[in-house]
Amino acid sequence: MGLFHSIFSLPSTINDSIEKQIYMPPYIPRFYYESLNTNYSKIFTRTSSNGDDIPIVQIRPKNNPFPQKYIVFSHGNGCDVYSVFSYLTNLSDKLDVGIITYDYVGYGLSRDNIPTEQGCYDSIEVAVDFLLNDYGLDPKNIYLFGQSLGTGITIDYAHKNNWNSPIILVSPYKSICTVVVDSCIVRPIDKFCTLNKIYQIKCPVKIFHGENDNVINITHGKKIYDSLNDKSLEPVWIPNTGHNDILDKITIQQIREVIDYFD
């Protein structure tokens, strides 16, 4: 499902190279997105603090038009809202919860803009504010769910907003550069520095990582778990699983453990 792609070389123009490798939005014809407007889902657009239009897709379970709980799903770097829609629709029905997914600046219907780290952070702010302000949802009923690149975006939001509800991280990383090389040489220009923020997060965190992940090594997930303040949710290290097939290996029961944490 369009996930985080590794950085294979670090040339002299290292910053430009990192930017190009981080953001790899798929090209999907604009009219395809019209199919995301259904009886159970709808596309909205909201504007970020920097004036960028952020596409948001709201998905409701077929048997529950007014769900009390919502997941905010932050996708990987090779995905957009269209490519994750089928997975999230199925997840919504099985969990009986609403789901919000959104595109980062430079992705999907926002593709005319240039993707940046700050643009990603602005985008999740818009998505969560949509639930808080438009729907008046209590933060305790919102669950952040990040995959690959989206884990760093999720952690940044939780860190800045003193988040208390449980969050889900699938294939998390310490930082972008350490996916390839754990060296102080590249740290001055590093991006999405998850490990630097995880120490200050107080909420429960559920981590999933494939033992055969050859894009983001499982040592990243284990280091993130070791650094958590709240270890009340056991991590799941999934055998015979890589980077691109992990979502299909996570069970509904494992995700429900997070959604029902406060029940």
Swiss-Prot record:
GO terms for molecular function: hydrolase activity. It holds the Pfam family Hydrolase_4. It comes from the Viruses. Gene3D superfamilies: alpha/beta hydrolase (3.40.50.1820). InterPro entries: AB_hydrolase_fold (IPR029058), Hydrolase_4 (IPR022742). A lipid is attached at G2 (N-myristoyl glycine). Its EC number is 3.-.-.-. Keywords: Hydrolase, Lipoprotein, Myristate. Belongs to the AB hydrolase superfamily. PANTHER family: ALPHA/BETA HYDROLASE DOMAIN-CONTAINING PROTEIN, PROTEIN ABHD13. This is Putative alpha/beta hydrolase L404. It comes from Acanthamoeba polyphaga mimivirus (APMV). The lineage of its organism: Viruses, Varidnaviria, Bamfordvirae, Nucleocytoviricota, Megaviricetes.
